[in-house]
Amino acid sequence: MKAAVLFQSLTGNTRKAGELIAANLQQEGWGITTVTPMKELQLAAIQEADVVIVGTWVHGLFVVGQAPFGIGAINHLPAMRGKLAATFCTFALNPGTTLDRLDTAVSYLGADVIGGLALHRSKLSEHTEEFAARLVANVPVRA
């Protein structure tokens, strides 16, 4: 399997999470077509991937509501019809409904979102291992 990892990062936590996810998938024998910010994406990286992983950070105040940062950038990604996708978000306090909203945005691109995980910024190592393990377990093996 091949994966493309796309992210939006402000402080570097989401970038680090994307890099750790890619490294964990490589340990499972997956190929990685890219690990890159969404704004620097090359279309070929999505075309070559079997699974597109989209990650961002949680934006907003705990009392007002949280949302995935950069939803506009996600909405402008190329169509992903026929692609499997997984999502992740990094957070400090509480992700709220960020992951659900991220799943919805990626689904609108035509991807079949098979899951996601909210990753606490102080537990990136263990949470990214869990993310990769869940992804490997839930992606159908190609014939």
Ranges and model annotations:
Residues 13-16, 24-35, 45-143:
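FMN-binding flavodoxin-like domain, especially the glycine-rich phosphate-binding loop
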Residues 37-41:
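Conserved SAM/SAH-binding loop
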Residues 1-4:
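Extreme N-terminal starter segment of soluble prokaryotic enzymes
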Residues 6-8, 88:
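Short hydrophobic segments within beta-strands
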